[in-house]
Amino acid sequence: MLVKNAENRGQLEFVSLENMVPQDHLLRKIDAAIDFKKIYEFVEDLYCEDNGRPSVDPVVLFKIVLIQHIYGIPSLRRTLEEVSMNLAYRWFIGYPLNEAVPHFSTVSYNFKHRFNHATVEYVFRWVLKAAAEEGYLDTEAIFVDGTHIKASANLKKQAKKAVPKQAKRYAKELFAEVNRDREEHGKKPFSDDSDKNPPQEKQTKETVVSTTDPESGVFHKGEHKKCFAYEAHTACDKHNFVLGVYVTPGNVHDSVAFDPLYDEVCRNYPEHKTVVADSAYKTPWICKRIFGSGRVLSTCYTRPKTKENGHPWWMYVYDEYFDDVICPEYRALHYSTTNREGYREYKSRAYLCKSCPTRGICTESSRCEKTVMRHIWQDYVEMAEHVRYMPVYKELYRLRKEKIERVFADAKEKHGMRYTQYRGLAQVTNWVKLKFAAMNLKKLATWKWNGRHPAPGGGKRSRLRENAPDISLLFPPVFLFSNRKPALA
């Protein structure tokens, strides 16, 4: 039977906002998970106590921004429109139906000029502390990776600019190690006197800069994808809680941004034992830093960067006893020098290579000389190679696609992190931190609610697997090295 409803748009009703929001609504779970009054402690020094006009409640401002990030709303203007019309949003911020919500420019101004990076960091750490108190964090192994965020900048509006070169963070330590190695081999150590007044071309490099957002960087992915972007270098635990994030321009390599991110993780979670990362992080310095601190780097296979149609890299074997490299024809390549980049150079004898039957696929040098380089920290890289074959670390690396990659997928597909409408590194950093704080808060609230409200019939709705096998380190790994080691061809 066809029923036509009568329009009663002008009808007056007495309703309770509390009764209009479902009991299992996500915002109810979030409101019950933590005490938002804690925010007053973070911002009280940013307001005057007895002067000026009354402000919008800072808790309301943070709740509005959390709504934006939790539901992936692209802009604050759109967020305030949704808050004005959505009953659940109004209930969450504590505004009745007949009260006007704050103007979007008020929220934007406060987060741009009043709430600084320290305030955002307090909120981010506060959510993680609440998760740790509930026992939801598992920081025995951390997963590290980076993802790009498209900047609000047109690729066609660009200019070439000379920018100063950034010194490597470990440059001093590497320089000392290089000089120590040269002295052990009877070589004169390098002097840094020549670097006091380097030529201009050595101080700067030419790069493409956006005229719209100069702090973004050109991001390349494959042969065709190219855009101005930022890079969010992120670390998470085995339960996908984001533990730290460091934002850089899109043209900064993952290995370069690793140190600031890892400093943050070590400062807050020094108990971690394993770092799981992809091949971009398998550099001599990162391997040295992780293994040197008593921890383990679990990474993947990397294809050797050797000459095509030449001898395989593993046919050049390093002899640790004699400090030589043995070539495929069983000739010794003797130590020549250690360069400033930290590589030992092993060179063959020209009179031996002239009559070598495989010289054509070994070297193209006009002097009939083969050079093999090996980094002074190569032993740590070989530790990562040995670890790669251990079952426990194989399993950890297999989980990488379910952990850090899942964090990035959720952030982009569900929470609107594929693009940013903010400009400037500071604004984008705060935006990313608040987004990850919202994701952590959503997970914390859901797990906490499921623990208090089990499913009917004794079923388990919680995603925590308390009886899951523990793949922690039962004993420190032992690495065995033979006297003959592969060298880098």
Language model features with spans:
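Short amphipathic alpha-helical interface patches used for protein-protein assembly/oligomerization
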Residues: 89-93
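Basic, short loop/linker segments at the boundary and entry of helix-turn-helix/winged-helix-like folds
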Residues: 23-66, 71-72
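Hydrophobic alpha-helical membrane-insertion signals
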Residues: 1-28
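Short secondary-structure boundary/capping segments within folded domains
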Residues: 18-21, 53, 224
